[in-house]
């Protein structure tokens, strides 16, 4: 079953792994601010992300959906 996905945020966590704060809805806006030339610090400050654990979620996120999709159906 093919599920339509937003390529920008489809694999970004909905909640922070450490504190559980809901952050997933902010990822697209974060990426937009970066594309406008803002630094990660400026973007996160403007979004109101203050906790270090939540900031880490944005700064260290690496999308691997395309790489993993090559193996869809290969196991089994």
From Swiss-Prot:
Coiled-coil parts of chain: none
Cofactor(s), names only, from the UniProt record: Zn(2+)
Which processes are annotated in GO (biological process)? DNA-templated transcription
What keywords would UniProt list here?
Answer: Cytoplasm, DNA-directed RNA polymerase, Metal-binding, Nucleotidyltransferase, Transcription, Transferase, Zinc
Which reaction(s) does the protein catalyse, per the Swiss-Prot or TrEMBL entry? Answer: RNA(n) + a ribonucleoside 5'-triphosphate = RNA(n+1) + diphosphate
GO molecular function terms attached to this record: DNA binding; DNA-directed RNA polymerase activity; zinc ion binding
Query: Which superkingdom, per the lineage?
Result: Archaea
| Family indicated by similarity | Belongs to the archaeal Rpo10/eukaryotic RPB10 RNA polymerase subunit family.
* Record's subunit section: Part of the RNA polymerase complex.
- What is the recorded name of this protein? DNA-directed RNA polymerase subunit Rpo10
| Species the sequence originates in | Archaeoglobus fulgidus (strain ATCC 49558 / DSM 4304 / JCM 9628 / NBRC 100126 / VC-16)
Task: Tell me the lineage of the source organism.
Answer: Archaea, Methanobacteriati, Methanobacteriota, Archaeoglobi, Archaeoglobales
């Amino acid at each position: 079953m093919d599920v339509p996905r937003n390529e920008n945020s489809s694999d970004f966590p909905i909640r922070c792994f450490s504190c559980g704060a809901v952050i997933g809805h902010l990822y697209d806006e974060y990426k937009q601010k970066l594309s406008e030339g803002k630094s990660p610090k400026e973007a996160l400050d403007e979004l109101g992300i203050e906790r270090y654990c939540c900031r880490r979620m944005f700064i260290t996120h690496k999308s691997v959906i395309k790489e993993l999709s090559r193996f869809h159906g290969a196991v089994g």
